[in-house]
Amino acid sequence: MSGTKSKEMDLTIGSPFWSLLKFAIPVILGNLFQLFYTLADSVIVGKTLGANSLAAVGSTSIIIYFVFCFINGFTGGFGICLGQRCGAKDEKGMRKSVAASTLLSIIFTIVLTLICCLLAHQILRWMQIPSDISGEAYDYMFVVLLGTGATVFYNMISNMLRALGDSKTPLYFLVFSSVLNIFLDVLFIVPLHMGVAGAAWATILSQFLSAVLSLIVGLKNFPILHLRREDFHDLNDTISLHLKTGFPMGFQMSVMCIGQLAMQTVVNSLGTAAVAGYTAASKADQLSVLVNNAMMTAISNYVAQNFGAGKKDRIRQGVRASLIQTEGFNLLMCIGILLLRHPIVRMFLSDPTVEIYHYSDAYLTIVAPFYFILGLLAVYRTSIQSMQNGRAPFAACMIELVMRIAATVGLSGIIGYTSVCIASPLAWFGACALLIPVYYRMMKRPLASAS
């Protein structure tokens, strides 16, 4: 493995518990820093451009989040394929995986950018954006979607580095990207007067520069990333595997936005206080989601490498260790959020009313105790995906979607806002009911070939 031996973190050896924790901590820090940036970005737009501009940016956030989730899942699937080849110590397979990922990412960028930009006006009409903010909403969304290539490039490089065992470099450049983004936000909006389009360009340029720098560091640390012409030969089987892994993961991550959109629609119908309380509570809820996503990234790369190496017992040990770590973090999140739920609301609202507290309290006190179900879902679903079983996670995703929509739309007329509060726990439980038995059945059988 001359191509990777210098910087690769081999997750097929050593203590599973400490290997996972060492890998996960940088990812958790990166996710938390990204959340901080998102909040700072909203403050800059709102304070400098006003409420209408903030509303314009916020009104398109679900569409942009939908696209970004698909990109992250799609390229994350490529990372699983590379991690499996890395675990198998298959240098030729690793090169072909990198080549296939690069080729598919280029094609995907071109197609997605064209579709998104051509449909931008129609998307805004579908969303019924108010006329007084539709112009700014279009400017912001069009620029962000025009820069889809930067997002794909950035996520592809980050997921490749993590697949090779390096979770620190993506952290460093995520921090760099976030700081640069905030600086460019201020520069483009205040002295250059570029409006919300300036905020969009700040996002795209910071991601692109971070991707380029990540690639430079990656090429230095991992010679396996230096592609040759022959690496692109006979890629049909490799491309097929990457598509089978990447598309379901992209779909699973983005389809969750549909369920969230249904929940938001019900909340919107309940009035301003409900929207304010739910929004503030959702910001706190994001902390747990980000931590669970980080643990998903860690166990994904761990299982992929050990699946490629054919080490079933080590996979079993790693899943147990990941469950302990994930549920430990979730317990801390639950206790912290429940104890600090009112100060958290005051972070986002200067003078919250009793009614707003009622809605935020209702959401957090119902959802937070069920974070442990989310932890089970995160670990088991990702472990199954990393062992080349995409059907069960896809089915679980559809169960989540159906249960989330059924709970909010079907029960809102009966129990009102409570339907929104119970939607996510019900969806998590339904998905786990399918995935946990699937995982244990898989572990009773010989591991399938990772070739």
Sequence positions of predicted segments:
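Transmembrane helical elements of multi-pass membrane transporters/channels
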Residues: 22-41, 143, 154, 177, ...
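Transmembrane alpha-helix boundary and packing residues in multipass membrane permease domains
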Residues: 27, 31, 43, 80, ...
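Helix-terminus/linker motif at the lipid-water interface of multi-pass membrane proteins
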Residues: 36-55, 124-131, 187-194, 254-287, ...
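N-terminal transmembrane alpha-helices
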Residues: 11-49, 65-77, 81, 106-113, ...
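Small-residue-rich hydrophobic transmembrane alpha-helices
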Residues: 54-114, 151-170, 277-335, 339-341, ...
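Interfacial/gating helices of multi-pass transporter permease domains
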Residues: 45-65, 132-136, 196-197, 238-245, ...
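Short runs within selected transmembrane alpha-helices of multi-pass transporters and secretion channels
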Residues: 75, 144-162, 170-178, 199-212, ...
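Short alpha-helical transmembrane segments in multi-pass integral membrane proteins
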Residues: 1-24, 82-149, 191-247, 303-370, ...
